[in-house]
Each structure stands twice: as structure tokens, then as C-alpha cells.
């Protein structure tokens, strides 16, 4: 029996946001070096206290935020790879000057992938727009991805 490939593979994902402190800008580490894999048919729930980065992970995977570093592979396609090289222990390989050793970075158009990926939030009252009808909420992704030929469909 062959080993089933991963549907989603996340390696060393980092999402930092710049924060101004006086004359300096420092990085706020919202997500710092997270790695996991999901096989077809599996479900992953991110659980943690408020402000720990759960939503940021989801938005970064969907590329609503540009990742700071790491690698995202969905169904065998590399969606993002910042190019850092890692050793067996997960540490970034650096050159003699202390600079990260990189290969070519990869960045792709996400529209074809977003119809296959989604985030589901636990609280439906903050997840669903109360000004939209159920028909509008369900129909919005169908409109975006042009998944019907007529309005009746």
C-alpha cells in the first residue's frame, strides 16, 4: 500500500506585521514557525486563546496576507515558498556571513485555489454578514469563481 500524499503541507510558516515604535519599525510575530500536514479526508481544528494567531494562520494560508516566510503546498502545487533552506532540525541554513541560504521564491495567483480552500469560524454571528440573504451568502463564491451558467442554476 502506497503512502497517501498530503492535501495541505505547511512548513515553517511565519507571518510578521511591521509595528512602528518611535523611529523604529519592529516585527510583530503573529505566527512564528508553524508546520503541519493534512491528508485528504482529514480535518484540522486550530484551537487556542484569543489573539494567539489562529485567524492569521488561516488568512495567511489563503494568501489574504502575504506570508513573511515558509512554504505552503496544496494538492501537490507550491502556493508559496519564500526560499529559505532548512536543515534536518528545522533551523534555517545560513552562509558564512549569517545570511539565510535561499533558492528562488515562488508566489502564485490564488484565485483557482480559493474555490477549493476555506476557513470556517466557530462563531456564526461574527462570520456571516447579517445584511446579506442566505442566497447571497451561498451565491457569492459561485459568482466569484463563475461556477454557473445562468442565474436560475
Where are these regions (language model features)?
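ABC transporter nucleotide-binding domains
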Residues: 1-153
Amino acid at each position: 500500500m502506497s503512502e497517501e500524499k498530503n492535501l495541505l503541507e505547511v512548513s515553517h510558516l511565519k507571518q510578521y506585521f511591521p509595528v512602528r515604535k518611535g523611529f523604529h519599525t519592529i516585527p510583530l510575530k503573529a505566527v512564528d514557525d508553524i508546520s503541519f500536514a493534512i491528508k485528504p479526508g482529514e480535518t484540522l481544528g486550530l484551537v487556542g486563546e484569543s489573539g494567539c494567531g489562529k485567524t492569521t494562520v488561516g488568512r495567511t494560508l489563503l494568501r489574504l496576507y502575504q506570508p513573511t516566510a515558509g512554504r505552503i503546498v496544496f494538492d501537490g502545487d507550491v502556493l508559496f515558498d519564500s526560499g529559505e533552506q532548512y536543515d534536518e532540525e528545522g533551523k534555517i541554513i545560513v552562509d558564512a556571513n549569517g545570511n539565510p541560504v535561499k533558492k528562488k521564491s515562488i508566489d502564485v495567483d490564488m484565485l483557482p485555489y480559493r474555490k477549493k480552500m476555506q476557513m470556517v469560524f466557530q462563531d456564526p454571528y461574527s462570520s456571516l454578514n447579517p445584511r446579506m440573504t442566505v442566497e447571497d451568502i451561498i451565491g457569492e463564491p459561485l459568482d466569484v469563481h463563475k461556477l454557473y451558467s445562468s442565474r436560475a442554476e
